Design a protein with these regions (language model features):
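NAD(P)H-binding glycine-rich loop region in Rossmannoid oxidoreductase-like domains
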Residues: 6-7, 33-93
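N-terminal Rossmann NAD(P)H-binding glycine-rich loop of SDR-like oxidoreductase domains
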Residues: 4-26
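Short beta-strand "acidic-cap" motif of Rossmann-like dinucleotide-binding folds
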Residues: 31-33, 147
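Active-site-lining helix/loop region of Rossmann-like oxidoreductase modules
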Residues: 9-14, 127-128, 136, 155-156, ...
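A generic structural motif
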Residues: 27-31, 193
Length: 213
């Protein structure tokens, strides 16, 4: 059976950690875990796992990690626009087509009502690079899914609903484990939600702001 080779960029993050847990025992999936500091992945090992230290903004390191991959899943923080540009370029250079890229709710002003106003007051000033990253990806020729999570919780649950670009965002919050479950599902079914920008939230969490505020 041919293994699907998956490159996880930002593999030390909390959502990525759940994705790794969902996928690490699937014999048909090989994970390359790319992150700045290997110590963030203590205890993660296996025959289908390769850990690489590197920086997404370091062209040569990213290019090396990208070779022979089938799917790239990026869950990053910081200069997301610059990172998106580097990732798209490296994928095109290496003939890798499938990209799953996590951004944020609010990048299209898609969050309605009082929650939309609250969200904008909290994170509106920092959303520009997230929107630019989505624009870079959406204008590429890649088979992308942009993922826009609601406010994140550490609840041990998988319970989510999706909205598409152009639709109003629904709930206020979602668990990191739920976002990871959706991403793991995309990795296992890579033809799903291609050329899509998907909002993800927990059903029934509509309101003026997340419950933990």
């Amino acid at each position: 059976m041919k293994q699907t080779k998956v490159l996880i960029l930002g593999a030390g993050g909390a959502i990525a950690h759940h994705v790794i847990q969902f996928l690490q025992h699937h014999g048909n999936i090989h994970l390359t875990l790319f992150l700045r500091n290997k110590s963030h992945l203590k205890g993660i090992k296996g025959p289908n796992i390769n850990i690489v230290e590197g920086d997404v903004l370091h062209h040569k390191q990213l290019n090396e990690a990208m070779k022979d991959q089938d799917i790239v899943y990026a869950n990053l923080a910081g200069s997301l626009d610059k990172m998106a540009r580097q990732i798209v370029e490296a994928m095109e250079k290496n003939g890798v087509r499938r990209l799953i890229f996590v951004t944020s709710l609010g990048i299209y002003n898609e969050v309605p009502g009082a929650f939309g106003k609250w969200n904008d007051s909290m994170i509106g000033n920092s959303l520009a690079p997230y929107r630019e990253a989505a624009d870079i990806i959406e204008t590429s020729d890649l088979d992308y899914t942009v993922v826009r999570p609601a406010w994140l919780t550490d609840n041990e649950e998988v319970d989510y609903e999706l909205t598409q670009k152009g639709e109003d965002f629904k709930g206020t919050e979602v668990s990191r484990k739920s976002v990871a479950a959706y991403i793991a599902d995309l990795i296992q079914h890579p033809r799903k939600n291609i050329k899509a920008s998907v909002g993800i939230d927990k059903p029934g969490t509509e309101g003026d702001k997340p419950s933990f505020y």
